[in-house]
């Protein structure tokens, strides 16, 4: 057999393959590569070199010191990384298609039926309250018989997980308060990237999550045994056995900024966008924008997506800053992926270099609906409160709130989507304050930047905070479209930076709204807090059960949703919805002080959701009229 190495670098003048028996070796075996007329460099070695570590030295005529850098193969299927600044890496030769999937296939699900749980692979098991035995995050996540991980996710009833970036990424940023590579780090005392929105390899799973470490080990090679490839598959297979689809959050609009040896060294002129002064464009805010319209860049993205589908059985993808990806690439991704799985899920952030959820919808993509998020919750908890607070944020009004119920369709004023299943309805994501913290601060019951010494007291919801959390959740789960919640939203998780962090964080003890760099209890789910707010957790479970059982909240026709007019109460809303001969009434009172009395259609109605509980088991019945106190919500079903 033979092992063939290829690298596309059309502007390079010389490329050398460097192989290593161990990644620690300072010098390896070097092989001069040959260039073809298409800009592809090639070297062929006799034998099948599985387990071999390798990289490329890429020389350009206009740059010095290129030969000092070992570049990572952009098509590497497994990667080992040395945990220090600049994240030096080596690719590993592995054999694909050797995993026993035990008959596993993709989960094909109508997008309207999706209930997505956005989560970080480590967060669900890293806190001791999860009850998980120390092991790698991939393995810990699927350990049975524990309070956290897959057991907790299954108990909620969600049917899809969306993993924060789990392609190999830049874990380590530049030294704090030091000049490095022309930059000065005055923003990140942790010198870490925990969320992973700095992709280093489009084809390899993140190696950190395959290590049996409680925290990142600095100055150590991780991923040497390529364990991530099998552990990632074990994880996907375990979720599929529970009927839970697996989506990946992927970042193709830029690459890892704080390292050498990536596509910027391989061929920056080909792969990146530049401004008219010759600097990297950074509409992503991450130092470089990937030139997705280049044929070989587009090909790499598409082949990456198809590889994750075929090799790892991934059911769907969420694209970070989707508007930075050119339209032709967006269209080809969906076209090629649907050949493999016609129900593959593609959603995105419809911003970054513009804002165009309608453009994505026209091309068959879903988008995160920031309009429902801001309209219902608000844009910020200080002076941008939304409907649940009895306020109108921006250009919201009762007409727009009604449009959110129907999927924010283009047929309504300021609508965004051609189809309801293109609207990813959410009130919380990894970005910004959690919904629980937004409400804590928005009510004035917790002051921003206050040092929180009693985290249990802070976590425990007041009666008013609980009402607002329930009202928001009820609106979310009864609206047409895709439903997404973020990990811990169901117990109003609070992201308090621990007082005992070992770095110079001036915000320690306060509530965080951008925890991307914290591999600590700020992000880890504390399941004791889920117990503290069990009433809210049970309410979420009941809403999930309700949505899954009754298609009226997922598949009702626009004409089958009929709104009830509430005179002189602008923040009250009601509607009836019919589907398959089953009729419901959904009622909300977001008024701050006023009760609302509503006349019901003729007949007897069972109560499925009241201000205390939610589910599919009737909580009582009612006829003729119903009175809603401020912040009450109800779902009634015709008896």
Model regions: which residues?
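The feature marks proteins involved in alpha-glucan
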Residues: 1, 25, 36-140
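Carbohydrate-binding surface patches
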Residues: 3-13, 545, 563-601
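Conserved, mostly hydrophobic/aromatic
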Residues: 7, 56, 119, 163, ...
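C-terminal beta-strand-rich structural cap/linker in extracellular carbohydrate-active enzymes
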Residues: 9, 51-52, 619-639
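Aromatic- and carboxylate-lined catalytic core of secreted/periplasmic carbohydrate-active enzymes
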Residues: 56, 527-562
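Substrate-binding/active-site clefts of carbohydrate-active enzymes
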Residues: 75-76, 122-312, 322-341, 345
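Conserved alpha/beta catalytic core and glycan-binding cleft of carbohydrate-active enzymes
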Residues: 334-504, 553-554, 558, 564-569, ...
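Tight coil/turn sites that cap or link beta-strands
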Residues: 430, 603, 612, 629-633
